[in-house]
Amino acid sequence: MGKATGFLEYGRKENPFRDAGERLHDYADLHTAQGTEERHCQAGRCMSCGVPFCQSSFGCPLHNLIPEWNDLLWRGEEREALERLLETAPFPEFTGRVCPAL
């Protein structure tokens, strides 16, 4: 899944906060979105664990298949990644806000 050495090559990148003055005037997202290239690099950080923590009983409470999703993003198959995500998370715009991994 992803790039075998991706976690060594790409640092974890958080989505930056939008300026507070800008946020006062709308109800848009608190963070700025990552671009396509940045999403690609972050998806490449998935380490292809033997037993992925994100798939354990302590991992994703929705049982999302995160390694598969990251691999699709890494390969540039964004539409397929979305379809895979929607199989287990019908409302990712809500559940993604409370994800314990973020």
Residue ranges of predicted features:
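Ferredoxin-type iron-sulfur electron-transfer modules and their immediate structural context
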Residues: 1-102
